[in-house]
């Protein structure tokens, strides 16, 4: 995938933001330097005789040093975060237009309601729910929506003085749901083992299924109300694709097939695309980002739920 023009535009934007960041960090460094200068003056006799109390000089110097260093890190984090968000939006707009030529809707500030995610039947209700990065598209009768989420659970404890405190356990990730033109009469869950966390639970009255592949069984748990349906959908090739999919992303993977929907959770997702304000953009980063963005579509294609055998009347599925 060659995107030289897009890389040039993004690189020009990076240099512009980096210039502003360096100016802000330079001013912060100057403040810290003033603090160091004040700190050194008593040792070299560079002080007014009116200053009888050296503590005033030291206090002032430490204040300048701490303030300068703090602002260096604050400005670096602020501009880097701003750059990453803007690049993320530009990447998405560029690649989503490439992948979904028939049209799509993307809104960073919007998300999906918890009720949409909860249709998967594997979530515990959180104490707080946050969502953003809403996306929606239709393609050849298939509806595809997604968003980022954070399932937050509160925990309370009392210290030795009797004071009550609250801690928060965050479960961030990405969620996607594909809606197909036809219904599947079974419930199927594929969950990466050691998913952990209190956000997810196992479905009721579903049998655990094991496959011939020992590697797949070690990495994934499969639950279904009909073993025949599970073997029908999760072919050896799908198993290999799921393991590769899991290797390619830093997250805990959960896939659910219910009625006419395919749900995909990428819990605790971390992008492997290392984008920095202070590092030049290159084609490899672009390709990695495009690959991550296309992962849900790749998984849906791998499971091939639109294949002809699902429409054959000889099958009860």
At which residue positions do the language-model features occur?
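Canonical alpha-helical transmembrane segments of integral membrane proteins
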Residues: 22-44, 62-67
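Cytosolic juxtamembrane N-terminal segments of multi-pass membrane proteins
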Residues: 1-23
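Hydrophobic alpha-helical transmembrane segments
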Residues: 46-66
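Juxtamembrane membrane-interface segments of multi-pass membrane proteins
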Residues: 1-8, 83-104
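Short regulatory "switch" loops immediately downstream of catalytic or recognition motifs
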Residues: 37-45, 150-159
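Transmembrane-cytosolic junction motif
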Residues: 15-18, 69-95
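Charged, low-complexity intrinsically disordered regions
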Residues: 93, 97, 101-102, 108-155, ...
């Amino acid at each position: 995938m060659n995107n030289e023009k897009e890389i040039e535009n993004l690189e020009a934007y990076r240099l512009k933001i980096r210039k502003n960041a360096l100016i802000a960090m330079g001013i912060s460094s100057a403040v810290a330097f003033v603090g160091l200068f004040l700190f050194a003056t008593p040792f070299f006799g560079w002080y007014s005789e009116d200053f009888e109390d050296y503590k005033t000089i030291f206090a002032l110097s430490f204040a300048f040093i701490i303030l300068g260093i703090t602002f260096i890190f604050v400005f670096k984090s602020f501009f880097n975060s701003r750059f990453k968000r803007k690049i993320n939006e530009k990447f998405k707009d560029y690649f989503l237009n490439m992948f979904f030529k028939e049209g799509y809707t993307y809104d960073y500030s919007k998300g999906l309601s918890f009720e949409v995610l909860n249709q998967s039947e594997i979530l515990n209700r959180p104490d707080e729910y946050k969502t953003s990065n809403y996306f929606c598209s239709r393609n050849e009768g298939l509806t595809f929506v997604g968003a980022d989420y954070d399932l937050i659970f509160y925990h309370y404890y009392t210290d030795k003085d009797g004071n009550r405190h609250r801690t928060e356990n965050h479960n961030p990730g990405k969620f996607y749901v594909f809606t197909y033109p036809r219904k599947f009469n079974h419930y199927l869950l594929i969950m990466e083992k050691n998913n952990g966390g209190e956000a997810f639970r196992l479905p009721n009255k579903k049998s655990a299924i094991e496959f011939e592949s020992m590697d797949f069984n070690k990495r994934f748990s499969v639950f279904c109300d009909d073993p025949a349906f599970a073997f029908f959908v999760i072919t050896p090739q799908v198993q290999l694709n799921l393991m590769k999919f899991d290797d390619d992303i830093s997250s805990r993977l959960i896939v659910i097939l219910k009625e006419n929907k395919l749900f995909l959770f990428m819990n605790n997702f971390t992008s492997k695309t290392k984008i920095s304000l202070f590092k030049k953009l290159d084609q490899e980063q672009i390709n990695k980002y495009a690959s991550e963005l296309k992962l849900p579509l790749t998984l849906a294609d791998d499971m091939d739920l639109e294949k002809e055998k699902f429409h054959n009347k000889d099958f009860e599925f």
